[in-house]
Amino acid sequence: MIQVLLVTICLAAFPYQGSSIMLESGKVNDYEVVYPQRLAPLPEGAVQQKYEDTMQYEFKVNGETIVLHLEKNKGLFSKDYSETHYSPDGRKITTYPSVEDHCYYHGRIENYEDSTASISACNGLKGHFKIQGETYFIESLKLSDSEAHAVFKYENVEKEDETHKICGVTQNWKSYDPIKKPSWLNLTPKQQTWPQTSVNLQLIVDHSMYAKYNSNSEKITKTLQERVNIMKEIFKPLNLDITLSGIEMWDKKDLITVKTAATDTLKLFAKWRQTDLLKRIDNDNAQLQTAVDFDGETVGLAFKSTMCDKRYSAGIIQDHSAIPLLMAVTMAHELGHNLGMDHDDTSKCNCNVCIMAPRLNTNPSKTFSDCSNNDYQKFLTDKKPKCIHKKSLKTDTVSTSVSGNEPLDDNVDGFHA
């Protein structure tokens, strides 16, 4: 029987005092200190898992007590999830770690139908929750002998770069449409009729990003897994599941030339995926994660309507923010282009700030507009991408064997040179 933990988060005095604090998410000027405390122990004789399947937390936001329900995201990893790095002499070293007892959760706020939450419980609580249109972030203060956490809003995080972030989406070699630098969701009756689809996503970490995180492979892995956990929540209303097939780190050197010219880098990365990655790792789509600062305001680039195409089902992402939600939105935006979505036209779409807005907004959204919904359905109808129509969704059970070089669908119509 699934055991439920009940934890209360007791609010301390609001610590203004003109001071700020440096968190993993950046420098935060306005925050509340909270102390997660477990109220109900497990029943006698019960075996406690490292990370319970379900958890409940009670805490206050703006003086209002709310109850947060969390459920482990069991479909986060593919059955053959792998992690790859390289030896000094260039040999690939691939492992298949156990991922069943992971620490990533989705959730909702009790009695609030439109609420959502995406939380990592790997080392304290880290993530965000949304209630009544307001998004709050929570993060451990990592103080010695203390369970203190900070709760804050995005607007209270100092921004090093105030320029707008944009996206570049390409439909052919010569035409580029340049996101720019700045649930518990229930399906509607219409969405319930949409086919269940699933994208197996592979993430590649280039050498610049590896160096940016001080060569800490474990930290990079947790960071990317946290972002994909949020992506999975974002795509749920489309009846589309995101599974992480693996993470590869170019820890010794880059396997392509990662240029500041995003379009050149995207072409090189897509070619590498076709000629190298697909021969050894089964995936529907791959995204390159880099710390290289792309020219202009561009922080992401992807081919449009190319999901399942062996040549062009790819995107590139600049690691432009320490806030997981912003990075997950950027990754979801570029994947949206692969799935046939255009940038939102605010004069025609029913959403002022949605996932496919051409610029990242100061109030990050996890919602697709009606235009994006229509684009996606048109893509499914017109292109008929076979790879994402899987007979059964994969689970977190990990095999010990290599998936092999299974051929992908040839009957796709995407971006052609």
Swiss-Prot record:
Binds 1 zinc ion per subunit. The active site is at residue 334. Residues 407-417 have a biased composition (Acidic residues). Expressed by the venom gland. Residues 197-392 form the Peptidase M12B domain. GO terms for cellular component: extracellular region; plasma membrane. Zn(2+) binds at residues 333, 337, 343. Keywords: Disulfide bond, Hemorrhagic toxin, Hemostasis impairing toxin, Hydrolase, Metal-binding, Metalloprotease, Protease, Secreted, Signal, Toxin, Zinc, Zymogen. Disulfide bonds join 308-387, 349-371, 351-354. Residues 398-417 are annotated as: Disordered. Residues 21-189, 393-417 form a propeptide. Its cofactor is Zn(2+). The keyword Phosphoprotein does not apply. Monomer. This protein is an alkaline zinc metalloprotease from snake venom that possesses weak hemorrhagic activity. Belongs to the venom metalloproteinase (M12B) family. P-I subfamily. This is Snake venom metalloproteinase aculysin-1. The gene is wbfib.
